[in-house]
């Protein structure tokens, strides 16, 4: 009888562990983890970031809505303890290797125009976003603010199992990014409300200098994105100085009801030499629309 009870207890623990793994929920965090929420030492996410030791420390956020505009200058991992964590605000990234998981970024009833902003003040390498969402921002869900005056580089962005919905200008707008991987994500109704003189897109990449490398989009849906601008599309990529080459890969993606599906190049400039590799793209109306007309 005792052996039977022991075996039953062991089986229960195995089943609980298996269910935790299958649900994708991490229940065991390092001892160094900082917890945020009502009744915890840190009641705001920013206070936990400020207290972190900048060595990839976990910041675990309890269920709830947090109205904050974060500034992240340390390497931290910000993880929702459940799928019920909403950030009504934004996060500005000025550190390498920042990680977000199970955070719902919301632009509703806030002053922030963008969900995540890559700081233009320094080069940033490594941003990982897993199982998050970006909805309802007046500009972009995720944006890099590099420009010709401050052409700081952003490299190694990885986004998985994340949705971008109804962001006014774009789901993602990246200036001067080189390495970019999107996998098992969805983009819907981004760029629909952009002014006609602005480019409404699900994803917009604009490289200021250098070459694209490892730009890949896998198993991702693009539905009803874009506006009436001639360069509007589900996916748009260009290069200001027109002095590069590179390859962009789409693998097992769905395109449905977008203003245009894929656009490369820039108007009024020669061909930009971007190679678009499309593998099993469902609904794609044409491989690529090239904006390479040398108009004067």
Question: What is the meaning of each model-derived region?
Answer:
Residues 9-21:
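Bacterial N-terminal signal peptides
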Residues 31-65:
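Acidic Gly/Asp/Thr-rich repetitive segments characteristic of extracellular carbohydrate-active
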Residues 86-92, 107-121, 136-154, 165-175, ...:
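Extracellular beta-strand/beta-solenoid scaffold signature
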Residues 38-40, 67-69, 76-118, 128-136:
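Right-handed parallel beta-helix/beta-spiral solenoid domain characteristic of secreted/periplasmic
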Residues 1-11:
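Bacterial N-terminal signal peptides that target proteins for export
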Residues 19-31:
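Sec-dependent signal peptide cleavage junction
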Residues 56, 64-65, 82-84, 227:
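Acidic glycine-/aspartate-rich tracts in secreted/extracellular proteins
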Residues 77-80, 98-102, 124-130, 154-159, ...:
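All-beta strand scaffolds that present successive hydrophobic residues in beta-strands
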């Amino acid at each position: 009888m005792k052996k039977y009870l022991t075996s039953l207890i062991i089986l229960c623990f195995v089943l609980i562990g298996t269910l935790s793994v299958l649900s994708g929920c991490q229940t065991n965090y390092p001892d160094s983890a900082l917890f945020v929420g009502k009744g915890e030492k840190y009641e705001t996410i920013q206070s936990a970031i400020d207290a972190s030791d900048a060595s990839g420390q976990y910041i675990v956020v309890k269920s709830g809505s947090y109205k904050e505009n974060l500034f992240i200058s340390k390497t931290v991992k910000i993880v929702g303890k459940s799928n019920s964590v909403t950030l009504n605000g934004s996060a500005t990234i000025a550190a390498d290797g920042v990680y977000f998981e199970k955070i719902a970024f919301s632009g509703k009833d806030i002053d922030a125009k963008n969900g995540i902003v890559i700081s233009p003040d320094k080069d940033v390498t490594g941003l990982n976003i897993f199982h998050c969402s970006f909805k309802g921002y007046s500009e972009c869900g995720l944006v890099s603010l590099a420009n010709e005056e401050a052409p700081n580089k952003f490299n190694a962005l990885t986004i998985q199992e994340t949705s971008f919905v109804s962001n006014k200008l774009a789901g993602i707008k990246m200036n001067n990014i080189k390495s970019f991987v999107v996998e098992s994500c969805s983009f819907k109704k981004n760029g629909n409300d952009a002014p006609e003189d602005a480019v409404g897109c699900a994803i917009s990449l604009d490289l200021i200098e250098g070459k694209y490398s490892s730009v890949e989009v896998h198993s991702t849906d693009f539905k009803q994105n874009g506006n009436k601008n001639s360069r509007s599309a589900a996916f748009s990529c260009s290069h200001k100085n027109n002095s590069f080459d590179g390859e962009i890969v789409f693998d097992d993606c769905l395109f449905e009801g977008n203003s245009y599906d894929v656009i490369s190049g820039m108007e009024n400039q020669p061909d930009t030499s971007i190679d678009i590799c499309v593998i099993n793209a469902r609904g794609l109306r044409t491989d690529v629309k090239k904006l390479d007309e040398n108009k004067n």
